[in-house]
Amino acid sequence: NDVIEVNSFPLAKLREVNLDTRRIGLGVMGWADSLVRLGLSYDSEEALQLADRLGAFLNSTAWDESARIAEERGPFPQYENSALKEWGMPPVRNSSVITIAPTGTISRIAGCSSGIEPHFAMAWWSNVLWTDHEGTSSKLLDSPASVFQSLQEALGTEDEAKRILEKIIEDPDNAEAIMGDHGLDAAVYRTAMKISAEAHVKMQAIWQKHVTNSVSKTINLPNSASVQDVKDAYRLAWETGCKAVTVYRDGSKSMQVLETGASREDEETQEDHLKVPRQRPVSVMGVTDRVRTGHGTMFVNLTFD
């Protein structure tokens, strides 16, 4: 509530609208991790039921707290003209309370899965850039913490968990068979590309029931997906009440942030794709320009050698 008051806006009109509606966006992060730790597959009926219960709890708790704050500080200014009043909702401090954001970057910092997305893969290569006095680039082998911990507990040792992940990296298309050979429930570890478009949409729709804004969700489709497959995914999202949805066909970009598969480019090829910044000189010449913006004065420093 206090953050809304002190927020800085580039235009006075934006500040006015935000203070009149006082929209906030509580959300979810780490959903896929939770399912793995509970032993539930992302595309199972049990996972949908759990999402329904958690979404309802989050939504009702958020509105209850918003109503409590409204008793102390008053409802949002546009409450009297809002649909919330028409629907019989008591005075609340915020016109909207729930948003499930992408959280793609902050979830990696936090070490958990993003939003309500399934895991992208059990193990993958992250395209990273390391810089030092010479400049180097490489790919980093990674795995979701919940997956690694679950495998370690199931298999008994950290080395065994690593061995399984190495096998999956080499042969990702047979990941479920590899896990089955080691007595693991492959369905629990089913990843984004192995989950049907229908299951992706159903998960989003169940959360959307309890979200007052939008849900960030990607429907992952294989490279072989047709135009009709994409059309069907969007139609199902519309029919199930999703406010917005994104469809991504694997390999539709020349370079992806995350990759699966056994092939790794050698260092020479990587350097062709990843540009390494050259070393900055100790002293450079430069000029400073003062630029007027809608958010005040900005100083831009331009340096060159």
Task: Label every model-predicted segment.
Residues 259-303:
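Short, Gly/Pro- and small/polar-rich lid/capping loops
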Residues 30-34, 50, 65, 146-150:
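A general alpha-helix detector
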Residues 1-19, 23, 40-103, 183-188, ...:
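Internal maturation/activation junctions in enzymes
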Residues 19, 29, 45-47, 81-84, ...:
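Short capping/connector residues at structural and topological boundaries
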Residues 1-6, 88-89, 98-257, 298-305:
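Catalytic alpha/beta core of large soluble enzyme barrels
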Residues 22-37, 105-108:
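Contiguous, well-ordered alpha-helical segments that form the cores/surfaces of helical PPI scaffolds
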